[in-house]
Amino acid sequence: MCIRDSQCPTILDNGFGGHRIEGIGDKHIPWVHNVKNTDMVIDIDDEDSQRLLRLFNCKEGQEYLKTLGLSDEQIEKFTWMGISGIANVLCCIKFAKFYELTEDDVVVTVLTDSAVMYKSRVEELNEMYGAYSAQAAELDHNLHMLNLKTDSMLELTYPERKRVHNLKYYTWVEQQGMSVEDLNAQWYDTKNTWDAVHAQAKELDELINAFNDEVGLLKAL
């Protein structure tokens, strides 16, 4: 499942534009995206993630969440989600609605960032929309989470996946000097491309652990 923004629907319909979801590339298909292994693309309006960032990180929003029966511990965990993480969760909600999932199903995503990175963005939103309130929190919750629809979603068939994969040519071959052979290998030779990358997991974990030990950030947590 690939998550993008509806303001720049490159995968969905070859669209272009700008957006405010950090970490999502604009107007191109990343070289390291295994498109052949992508079953669905889901686009989310960047306004949804912005509004919920504010809901989860403003005192008034957190007080509203308490009225829904959430504990302080649960509310604190919402601050673990940054803009991209919120977008991922919202797309999981759309995914669950699309496939009519129930409490017996499990959907897993990744929280790729934390709200700690976006304190200035929350301040910008407060300046843009004015002081936050319980009424605004209730509106944001209902409009930008509960009201999510199954729009801007596409199950990718084999030809559609290849259409998306071929978009890499214009960025990576024409502009960045990658070869057509390398591009074709990503599609036709998965054993020596994507599978080979996955086989490096143990080595990559060791490098990550060594880096974390060197910088010492995890020791402070």
Q: In which residue ranges do the predicted regions lie?
A:
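Non-catalytic interaction/regulatory modules that flank or connect domains
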Residues: 97-104
